[in-house]
From Swiss-Prot:
One or more lysine residues are methylated. InterPro entries: Ribosomal_uL11, Ribosomal_uL11_bac-typ, Ribosomal_uL11_C, Ribosomal_uL11_C_sf, Ribosomal_uL11_CS, Ribosomal_uL11_N, Ribosomal_uL11_N_sf. Keywords: Methylation, Ribonucleoprotein, Ribosomal protein, RNA-binding, rRNA-binding. PANTHER family: 60S RIBOSOMAL PROTEIN L12, LARGE RIBOSOMAL SUBUNIT PROTEIN UL11M. This is Large ribosomal subunit protein uL11. The gene is rplK.
Length: 143
């Protein structure tokens, strides 16, 4: 068995799918750890070309020999909720100002998409997490 590589950094970034480029903020974040920025951009864009227009979180593991691996996550719940509710952004005051609404079916659909990244045991628990995110954004959940 080959010896394990030593990890030098773990970066968590949210990048627009298919639009990774060496410009800030991505370039400086990767460059400071010695990663080949263009190589990462090409690999990330190729991996996310089918998800254009979405923000895809990525976890980049940088090793001491300057090589890297990355894991793509599911889009943020807030982004999926904004898309489902048809709004540009959430509210500053979710208690008094509601900006949109989503149905329980839409919440279930989002929870099923996010299940891999949620710390929930089943879809019902995942729905509660997504509904809580919706409430904090000023989005009401209707039957």
């Amino acid at each position: 068995m080959a010896p394990k590589k030593k990890v030098s950094a773990l970066l968590k970034l949210q990048i627009q799918a298919g639009k990774a480029n060496p410009a800030p903020p991505l370039g400086p974040a990767l460059g400071s750890h010695g990663v080949n920025i263009m190589d990462f951009c090409k690999q990330y864009n190729a991996a996310t070309q089918d998800k254009m227009g979405q923000v895809i979180p990525v976890e980049i593991t940088v090793y001491e020999d300057r090589s890297f691996t990355f894991i793509l996550k599911t889009p943020p719940a807030a982004a999926l909720l904004k898309k489902a509710a048809g709004i540009q952004k959430g509210t500053e005051n979710p208690l008094t100002h509601k900006v949109g609404s989503v149905t329980k079916a839409q919440v279930r659909e989002i929870a099923e998409i996010k299940m891999a990244d949620l710390s929930a045991r089943d879809v019902e628990a995942g729905m509660k997490i997504i509904a809580g995110t919706a409430r904090s954004m000023g989005i009401t959940v209707t039957d």
